[in-house]
Amino acid sequence: MLHIFYIYSKSRKFWAILICSSISLISIALLNQFFFLLKPCILCIYQRCSLFGITIAGLIALISPKTTLLRLFSIFIWLYSAIKGLYFSNIHMQTTLHPSSSLTCDLFVSFPNWLPLNKWYPIIFDSKISNCYSYPQYLLYLEISQWMLLFFLIYLIIAIFTIISQCHNLFQKK
């Protein structure tokens, strides 16, 4: 099974599927925001950033998926983005399903000074809603934050298998 992950990770199709899946989720979020007028909360913005991180990882690997260093760099970006997305979706799920005064969102989106996405692209990366449990949205009996938790968990599991397959192949050659 690890060999299959290793072989697929060296193909452009693998990375194109990763890019398409993350862009699909970003598109759904933007559709909800602009067409259905559902304003994103701060945790939604952070999850959106994690999806952009996964997309960037896929784009980097798409340049040359057979180059080991580039592929490993992309997998680590993917892994980090999936972990951060899982973290934010878990917090979002907890605040949505179990609202309390101890679980609250930040008042403002905070990005590093060297990457102020909320100032560069406020229409995508800024939120006017600081209350993360004010608008729970359901799809097929699950709240959106639960779906995002599931998606980030799938991204994380696939990224872990992919990085293990890379390490397995590197050590097997020696």
From Swiss-Prot:
List the GO cellular component terms. plasma membrane
Q: Which GO terms describe its biological process?
A: protein folding
Residues on Periplasmic side: 32-49, 91-146
Q: Which residues cross the membrane?
A: 15-31, 50-65, 73-90, 147-165
Q: Which UniProt keywords apply?
A: Cell inner membrane, Cell membrane, Chaperone, Disulfide bond, Electron transport, Membrane, Oxidoreductase, Redox-active center, Transmembrane, Transmembrane helix, Transport
- Which GO terms label this protein's molecular function in UniProt? electron transfer activity; protein-disulfide reductase activity
User: InterPro entries, per this entry?
Assistant: DiS_bond_form_DsbB/BdbC (IPR003752), Disulphide_bond_form_DsbB (IPR022920), DsbB (IPR050183), DsbB-like_sf (IPR023380)
Q: Where in the cell is it found?
A: Cell inner membrane
Q: Which residues lie on this side of the membrane: Cytoplasmic?
A: 1-14, 66-72, 166-174
Membrane topology category = Multi-pass membrane protein
Please name every pair of cysteines joined by a disulfide bond in this record. 41-44, 105-132
Role played: Required for disulfide bond formation in some periplasmic proteins. Acts by oxidizing the DsbA protein.
Family according to the record: Belongs to the DsbB family.
PANTHER family assigned: DISULFIDE BOND FORMATION PROTEIN B (PTHR36570:SF2)
NCBIfam families named in the record = PRK01749.1
Q: Which HAMAP family does this UniProt record tie to the protein?
A: DsbB (MF_00286)
Protein name per Swiss-Prot or TrEMBL: Disulfide bond formation protein B
Tell me the organism: Blochmanniella floridana
Gene that codes for this? dsbB
